[in-house]
Amino acid sequence: MATFKSNRNPEFRSKFSEDIFNLKYSHAGCDTWQQLSSVLVQDVCGDLREGEESLMTKDEMSQLTKYITELKFVPGGRYLYYAGRKNRYYNNCFLLAAEDDTREDWANLSWKSESCLMTGGGIGVD
């Protein structure tokens, strides 16, 4: 049985894993696993977070990028998907409530529910 080796993403051990990456996570600016790893660490921990200080030093970010690139640590799919994208919905659980038992509040709850669901979030209603 031949061993799979990709020229573009040598980290992947099977064509199936590379196909999943290409179908679900690859996009402009993150065409390879290595690019996605670097952008993800910058987005979440680095200086790409507008108006906020980096959560990690450059050395720590470099080490984390290396771990992700080598598949020693793989972040959740939601983080992989949103890396480098304009809109990011890392947290996707919402708890909603109707404040008063009125038509208006129930209509507002419906609107909030639809808005949450359109971002791919899950909802709970208290």
Regions found by a protein language model. Give the residues of each.
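Extended catalytic cores of very large enzyme megasubunits
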Residues: 1-126
